[in-house]
Amino acid sequence: MLLRYLFILFIIIPIKAFALIEVDITRGNLNPLPVAVSPLSIDNKSKENFKKILKQEDLGSEISIVVENNLRQSGLFNPLDKNAFLQEPDVANLKPRFEDWNLIKAQALVTGKVTFVDEKLRVEFRLWDVLAGKEMMALAFTTVPSNWRRVGHIITDKVYERLTGEKGYFDTRIIYVSEEGPKTKRIKKLAIMDQDGFNNKYLTLGNELVLTPRFSPTNQMVTYLSYFRNLPRVYLLDIETGMQEVVGDFPGMTFAPRFSPDGKKIIMSFAKDGNSDIYTMDLENRIVERITNHPSIDTSPSYSPDGKKITFNSDRSGYQQIYVMDSNGKNVKRISFGNGLYGTPVWSPRGDLIAFTKLHKGKFYIGVMRTDGTGERLLTENFYQEAPSWSPNGRVLIFYRETKTNSKGEGFSAKLWSIDLTGYNEKMVETETDASDPSWSSLLSN
């Protein structure tokens, strides 16, 4: 799990020519790029060693499956059926017969090799432009064997970046609230998993209600809201050590905690004397600063990536809308003016958009708008859905959605969903239990 155990060793072969392949991710992709992901070749001795350590029959094939599934889930790529491949993995990795790959309509090809070296996992991979008959990229990784799924995610990130021109989002994690039990008596725990739903781990026991977990910029810490003895408090949790602490001792109710981009502060909403305003706390000296001072309800603050601006929602106009202000609370400006109520605004890591939840005529929408309020687009609608969180490249949103219950209160569920920025590729994210309040980490490796 620790990042220091995975290293990119070297670039084997530099890119010598511009490839013909180009994937446009700014529009809904109705024609995903056909890509062949060949099983990574592996010698018999390495196969036996990994089988003993990891209980995996063929680690080369397993890593290629991770890459294939990631590419398919992105909606931008169409991994081809391996049964149609005409060339063996070990041969394809050395020198592909491009005419064979052209026959099955592949435009890009991923090949590679897995070996067991000095008790470590070594993975080499290559990306080929089939149409141009050229190698586009070649990299090698060495890590502990248990990190094999992460290697698959990192390979996907490299392929995604080379073919789209933008960073990927596959070597990431999602923290969320796991939910079990009847709707009126839910057991809620903090849980964390890889972005594809694997390696799920519970971080709390479910003895207290937990809400709104959010990652720190380093991905090591999480801030969240928990009810202890029926009092809501903001907590910090170290994911690696399991240590947690209360962030201050506020006499009122605290809500919606989130880290500043530099990780030095937590911004939150604090209710006192019937009024809710936005505050920050310096995590080093624990000094609390009041950012808004208004008789309305101000909540759900989120920083811009450079830390200079804050977006939040407030009912100061009479009903719930989205506002933007300087990080010191000055120059408050309303930016949402459409019909309905707006909430849970969150700034894109790219800095260009704000995602939000909207309630209008009994339906909930997940949408985006520019930071000045123009260009509002509603991406998806449902009976109930909220709490969008951005992928680190700002191209995908994850949120949660609830189902209706029948007259007996049966049939309730809460699930995580994702959708890309164009409004396409909407899909459910698999979790072990019901799930809500997702937060997407930044990339674990660059």
UniProtKB/Swiss-Prot annotation:
Signal peptide from the UniProt entry: 1-19
Superkingdom field: Bacteria
Stretches that traverse the bilayer: none
Cell location: Periplasm
A GO biological-process term: cell division
Swiss-Prot/TrEMBL keywords: Cell cycle, Cell division, Periplasm, Signal
Gene3D superfamilies: TolB, C-terminal domain, TolB, N-terminal domain
The keyword tRNA-binding belongs to this UniProt entry's keyword annotation: no
Entry's Gene Ontology cellular component terms: periplasmic space
Keyword Nuclease among record annotations: no
Protein function: Part of the Tol-Pal system, which plays a role in outer membrane invagination during cell division and is important for maintaining outer membrane integrity.
Self-association state and partner proteins as the record states: The Tol-Pal system is composed of five core proteins: the inner membrane proteins TolA, TolQ and TolR, the periplasmic protein TolB and the outer membrane protein Pal. They form a network linking the inner and outer membranes and the peptidoglycan layer.
Entry's family note: Belongs to the TolB family.
Protein's name according to its UniProt entry: Tol-Pal system protein TolB
Gene source species: Pelagibacter ubique (strain HTCC1062)
Gene: tolB
